[in-house]
């Protein structure tokens, strides 16, 4: 017989079965509801508890104790001979006779037998089963020895009345023998691990009549045991879910033609046919309308508005506008079309992909960017902008050359272009990295080439006497033009200051560049010890379009207040320069140019001091040879050569080796710049004063630098 566990498991206590619609309408019979009513535990299939290691093993026999070890207590010997009469237990009447027989049977044994150690029983349903089985087995012995017990009772009449209260253990023992339900002892020490985890399913307290009927059925062997239908043959799954329809057999056309009224009915419709007939018959009998009892079917429910459907609607209810999908409550006529739904998004994605492709290829230029590169004024940013076309450039752009040798404009007018071309070729053949300049003091805002020692004094005095009238004539011509007023005055001032302060404060710095153009090779840069920047790592020697510009030096409010007007500043500078030029001695020994640090107004890199000194010392003999060859009686002095030093231009130019996207045009590159910290506040003041005098040119310069700075910041896009 299979073991069927009828107790409440932990799963059944925590997870209750959710009643379906069918189970609520299903009304089982009483026998099906209480299938275990009136059955003993052994009949339920529970014979014993599972054997656990933690459960103490107890023998199944009563231990034999000798009489001299028995404990008599306060009972006298004569009382032990006369057994007490059984107490009438308050139980139903059908049980009185049976309990009297059990009590008479107990009188044969002495009263102390109840104090004999009993076998240890577990307090689960199997203990009740054992008690019930013991009662059934002893029932035969009681019927056989009934006459003998009565004779013994007659021979030994009871002389002592029954005590008012019976010991609870004895009462529990009698209840067990009678087959009644006994409340288990709540002793935690005797509970097993299994009992502590799982609570047995206990029935409700039954009425006295039910208890008597239970005892009567358990004791009598004539009446068969009532066993109802312990399990339901039809499962709930079969009741709720119907199987697939059987496979239809092939039918002939003739059969279908003969039975034209043949209708294929599903099993659900066939099951509903008797219900329809009953409803029709009932409606004919009574005029009152009767509602048809709709049986429960396993059918698909209606459309439920779930949370997912409320949040995620169909794409037809959205419209793409301004880079985002927005929900449109009103139904539009053209909303469901492909153009309205997807065309805008696809177009935007393709434009983004094209911009990303151009960014990777380096061709993402706007119209303004391209116009600036291809414009005519682009040559102003060139390093080697001293060309025949430079004379046609407007003077306001010429003023951007803040630190250059501005005598080139005068030499263009004095000498024919053929001689100028020869000089430029001669300069290009010389190592350009040996040129030296200096911007040390604020009184000398421009750069002048260092003169030789033997004609330093004479040559300079001649230059002063010859250049001043020519400079005045150039200034008078420039005043006639509206666009060249500020630039012409600035050229005179810078020229005179270069003549006065050139020998003593002339600069020497080295700009190392490659002769052919482009960036120097990496081994050469490593030998020079030049610190590389992120542009050197990414920008190739040919091509590329990375445009950067240095940070703009903004003058403070006090400096702006102290700035004189353009006319006053020019007059004061002229007077001061002429005085200094007359009284200052010119000698090479007192000149601080040899081995001095130079000042770069816009430094971009950091160079070591040792590199600057080493290159400056190496350039001295080269300069001597260069000046000796070019300084002939028929030619002007080297200070008037139409050459503008590369480092004197505005940094951040388009044709700089940092931005080599204008290929095929002659240029001079500057790869070695000055050490960090050489740029001071005095240089910023000088730049601000010059830009204030040339308002038009400075405005254009700052606008160009601002555009370059903006392109630099927006090159990779803002995060």
From Swiss-Prot:
The modification Phosphoserine is found at residues 124, 127, 266, 283, 286, 314, 565-566, 591. A motif (ST]-E-Y-X(3)-F motif 4) lies at residues 306-312. It holds the Pfam family MDM1. Residues 503-514 have a biased composition (Low complexity). A motif (ST]-E-Y-X(3)-F motif 3) lies at residues 235-241. GO terms for biological process: negative regulation of centriole replication; retina development in camera-type eye. Keywords: Coiled coil, Cytoplasm, Cytoskeleton, Microtubule, Nucleus, Phosphoprotein, Repeat. InterPro entries: MDM1. Residues 339-364 form a coiled coil. This is Nuclear protein MDM1. The gene is Mdm1.
